Amino acid sequence: MARMHARRRGKSSSVRPARNEAPAWSNTDKAAIEKLIVDLRKEGTSASMIGLVLRDRYGVPDVKMVTGKSIGDILTENKVSSEIPEDLRDLMVKALGLRKHLGENPKDLHNKRQLHLVEAKIRRLVKYYIGTRKLPAGFTYKPENAEILLSR
């Protein structure tokens, strides 16, 4: 795949091994894993960090292979998922940081362009999440309100 905002090819990355069942050394207790996911979320850990913690500390290489559900599905099932999807939240944090930087350095044209690209990506994601009903129909991204949304 090519890059979105550059005329270059993407970088190759590692591929997960094709498996149908969990390895013998892994932790495969479904109830314990689901409880651990909910507990980590209540501590304030994001969904992607939960996956890393389960992989590195608890020996769970793939949650979906063990439980049959993704981490996001488990979080919504237990009503502890965040109101704003994680990828959108991360982009909003990035845009706020760029806005703060541009407030202090108004002549930084490279980062001004990066802010435009990030905010364009935010608007595309908002449109997608409204279509999939993960965000309410009247939701719009406004930089002034983004800081308030993220502080919740």
UniProtKB/Swiss-Prot annotation:
GO molecular function: small ribosomal subunit rRNA binding; structural constituent of ribosome
Start and end residues of each stretch annotated as Disordered: 1-25
Domain of life: Archaea
Biological process terms in GO annotation: translation
Keyword Kinase: no
UniProt feature, compositional bias: Basic residues: 1-11
Record flagged with keyword Ribonucleoprotein: yes
GO cellular component: cytosolic small ribosomal subunit
Pfam families in the record: Ribosomal_S13_N, Ribosomal_S15
Keywords annotated in UniProt: Ribonucleoprotein, Ribosomal protein
Family: Belongs to the universal ribosomal protein uS15 family.
Record's subunit section: Part of the 30S ribosomal subunit.
The protein, known as: Small ribosomal subunit protein uS15
Source organism of the structure: Methanoregula boonei (strain DSM 21154 / JCM 14090 / 6A8)
